[in-house]
Amino acid sequence: MAAVVENVVKLLGEQYYKDAMEQCHNYNARLCAERSVRLPFLDSQTGVAQSNCYIWMEKRHRGPGLASGQLYSYPARRWRKKRRAHPPEDPRLSFPSIKPDTDQTLKKEGLISQDGSSLEALLRTDPLEKRGAPDPRVDDDSLGEFPVSNSRARKRIIEPDDFLDDLDDEDYEEDTPKRRGKGKSKSKGVSSARKKLDASILEDRDKPYACDICGKRYKNRPGLSYHYAHSHLAEEEGEDKEDSRPPTPVSQRSEEQKSKKGPDGLALPNNYCDFCLGDSKINKKTGQPEELVSCSDCGRSGHPSCLQFTPVMMAAVKTYRWQCIECKCCNLCGTSENDDQLLFCDDCDRGYHMYCLTPSMSEPPEGSWSCHLCLDLLKEKASIYQNQNSS
C-alpha cells in the first residue's frame, strides 16, 4: 500500500496528493453530516427506513485500543428512554364522569359491583362509548412520530383496547367487529351505486345525442346523423327489398326521423336559405334567382353565393352527398370528432382530418388547399396550383 502511495505522490506531486486527500476528507465529512441531519430517512438504494443511531463519533471521543489488534476505542453510549411530554389537558380525551343519579340507577340494576368498578360497568352497558373513549396510556412520542391524517386513524390510536382486557372476549367480538363490517358493506354498496349513477350522468352529459333504434350515444348531431345514414339506413333498404311489409314503428321519434328522409336516403331539403331567408326564386342579398344547395344530413339549404362557393365548388357539391358546416365529417374516417382538426378542400368543400391525411399535417397550410380527389380530377386547374401561380 505504501508503495502505491509513493508512486502516486511521485507521479502527481506531493502538494496535489495532499489537496486530493483534503478534498476527499471534506466530502466525506459533508456526507456524514448530511446523513446525520436528515435521519431518519428512506434509503433509495436499499429501500430501508434508516433510524437515528449513535454510530457516528467525533475525534474527541477517540481513545486508545483496549484489546489486542484494536487501534482505537470509543466510549459506549448509555441508552436512555425518551422523556415523554405531559398529556394534553383536552376534555375530549378524558373519561366522562358518572353523575350521582346515574350511579344510583346502575347500583339498583346491579350493574355496578360492590368493589366500585364503575368504569367496567359503564363500558359493558354502552359499547358506543367504548369506541370513542381515549386511552391515556398512548405514548405521546408515537403520536408525534406518526402524524394522524384522518379521523379514522385518530380513533384507532386513542381506542381504549387496553382497558378492555378484563372483559369477556365474546362480548367484545359481538359489539365492535360485526357492526363495523355491516357499516363497511353498506357504505360500499352505496358508494358503488353512487359511482354508477355519476358515470351514467356524465355519459348523458358528454353524449346528449342518442339513437332511438339501438341506443348508441354521440357527442354531437353530425355523428348521430352519420350513424343513422350508414347503420340503420342500409338495414332499412335491405328490409324493404326482402319484405314489402312496413316495419313496426319502434317509437314516435323514430317515425319522425324516418319521415324526414327522402326516398334516396337523403334528408328532405328546406326550401329557404338559412343565411338570407330567400328561396330558389330570389336571393335577398343579390335580388337574383339562385339554386339552393342542401345538406344531405340535416336538410338545411343555402345559396352558393351566401356560402361563398366558387364556380368549381358549385359544380363539385352536386356530385356527392354535401354536408353543411355543422354536419361536416371527415371524408376518410367518417367521424366528426376533433372538428378543430378538420381541413376543407377549396375545390369540393370536403372535410379531412389533418392527421388522417397522407402525409399527415400538424398545422393547416397557408392559402388554398386541394384534396387528392380534386388534384386527380382538376390537375393544373386545382386551387392549390392557382394560388401558387398567382403568388
Curated annotation (Swiss-Prot):
The UniProt record lists the keyword Zinc: yes
Kindly list the positions at which Phosphotyrosine occurs in this protein.
Answer: 172
Q: Name one GO biological process term.
A: positive regulation of stem cell population maintenance
- Alphabetically ordered keywords of this record: Acetylation, Apoptosis, Chromatin regulator, Cytoplasm, Isopeptide bond, Metal-binding, Nucleus, Phosphoprotein, Repeat, Transcription, Transcription regulation, Ubl conjugation, Zinc, Zinc-finger
- Asked whether the keyword Acyltransferase is assigned, the reply is no
Write down the CDD domains for this protein, in alphabetical order: PHD1_DPF2_like, PHD2_d4
Task: Name the principal localization, coarsely classed.
Answer: nucleus
Q: Where are the zinc fingers (PHD-type)?
A: 270-330, 327-377
Which portions of the chain have biased composition (kind: Acidic residues)?
A: 165-174
Q: Which InterPro entries match?
A: DPF1-3_N, Znf_C2H2_sf, Znf_C2H2_type, Znf_FYVE_PHD, Znf_PHD, Znf_PHD-finger, Znf_RING/FYVE/PHD
Q: Name which cysteines form disulfide bonds.
A: none
One Pfam assignment:
DPF1-3_N
Region spans: Disordered: 79-147, 165-199, 233-266
Q: Which residues carry this modification: Phosphothreonine?
A: 176
Q: What family does this chain come from, according to its entry?
A: Belongs to the requiem/DPF family.
Subunit structure comment from the entry: Interacts with the nucleosomes, in particular nucleosomes bearing histone H3 crotonylated at 'Lys-14' (H3K14cr) for which DPF2 has high affinity. Also interacts (via PHD-type zinc finger domains) with histone H3 butyrylated at 'Lys-14' (H3K14bu), histone H3 propionylated at 'Lys-14' (H3K14pr), and histone H3 acetylated at 'Lys-14' (H3K14ac). Interacts with histone H3 acetylated at 'Lys-9' (H3K9ac), histone H3 di-methylated at 'Lys-9' (H3K9me2), and histone H3 tri-methylated at 'Lys-9' (H3K9me3). Interacts with histone H4 acetylated at 'Lys-12' (H4K12ac).
What is the protein's name according to its record?
A: Zinc finger protein ubi-d4
Q: Source species, please?
A: Mus musculus (Mouse)
